[in-house]
Curated annotation (Swiss-Prot):
Function: Binds directly to 23S rRNA. The L1 stalk is quite mobile in the ribosome, and is involved in E site tRNA release.
Keyword entries, A-Z: Repressor, Ribonucleoprotein, Ribosomal protein, RNA-binding, rRNA-binding, Translation regulation, tRNA-binding
GO terms under biological process: regulation of translation; translation
Subunit structure: Part of the 50S ribosomal subunit.
Protein's recorded name: Large ribosomal subunit protein uL1
Family: Belongs to the universal ribosomal protein uL1 family.
Keyword Nucleotidyltransferase: no
Lineage: superkingdom: Bacteria
CDD domains xref list: Ribosomal_L1 (cd00403)
Keyword Ribosomal protein assigned: yes
Molecular function GO labels: rRNA binding; structural constituent of ribosome; tRNA binding
Length: 232
């Protein structure tokens, strides 16, 4: 394991690793313990009591955070005709079909999210092996395979984030930047936590949310006690 820098070590001293903090305290600490010289991302991590190996315990979806993520997402839309015009009018960064499939096959990835109309998925499927490992493959569960391209582009630009449980039963998702006001980070966290609760698989047994923490890009993890706030 790489040796932690002096700033990180000093920041970590501010955190009691045995304690689960009030959510407001936790967010305050995230800002205090940030050691990056840039506007670092604040991330929430949820350790869940699910078995991702079982299809009925997979968790995947997307949610629009009330205060956005602080990052401008570059959107590529695969669509034709009127739907292509709709995507352009909505502010998509790139709109096309076979031309962009060829570019991606040649190693072009100057985008963050792909939206595709259902009739284009046969073509998009040709680059599935390239997109899949990068988490870029459009999926109906995240609202990125749809004929409602205007809505999809608008939501992504407004701060929509995708979430997916990993092989270890964890979900990691950005909830903003350290430059955000604490209240806005708390609101985003609450929205994400509420979304995770509602996504609980019926087949999940025992304790569902085992651990919750927040951290900045180069800061220490801070445990959160979700019972310290009410999620509507």
């Amino acid at each position: 394991m790489a040796k932690k820098g002096k700033k990180y070590v000093e920041a970590a001293k501010l955190v009691d690793r045995t304690k689960a903090y009030d959510v407001n305290e936790a967010i305050e600490l995230v800002k205090k313990t940030n050691t990056a010289k840039f506007d670092a991302t604040v991330e929430a991590a949820f350790r869940l009591g699910v078995d991702p190996r079982k299809n009925d315990q997979q968790i995947r979806g997307a949610v629009v955070l009330p205060n956005g993520t602080g990052k401008t997402q570059r959107v590529l839309v695969f669509a034709k005709g009127e739907k292509a015009k709709e995507a352009e009018a909505a502010g998509a960064d790139y709109v096309g079909d076979a031309d962009y499939i060829n570019k991606i096959q040649q190693g072009w990835f100057d985008f963050d999210v792909i939206v595709a109309t259902p009739d284009m998925m046969g073509e998009v499927g040709k680059i599935g092996r390239v997109l899949g490992p990068k988490g870029l493959m459009p999926n109906p569960k995240t609202g990125t395979v749809t004929f409602e391209v205007e809505k999809a582009v608008n939501e992504i630009k407004a701060g929509k984030v995708e979430y997916r449980v990993d092989k270890a039963g964890n979900i990691h998702v950005p909830i903003g930047k350290v430059s955000f006001e604490e209240g806005k980070l708390v609101e985003n966290f609450a929205t994400m936590y509420d979304t995770i609760l509602k996504a609980k698989p019926a087949a999940a047994k025992g304790v569902y949310v085992k651990n919750v923490s927040v951290t900045s890009t180069m800061g220490p993890g801070i445990k959160v006690d979700p019972s310290t706030f009410n999620v509507k």
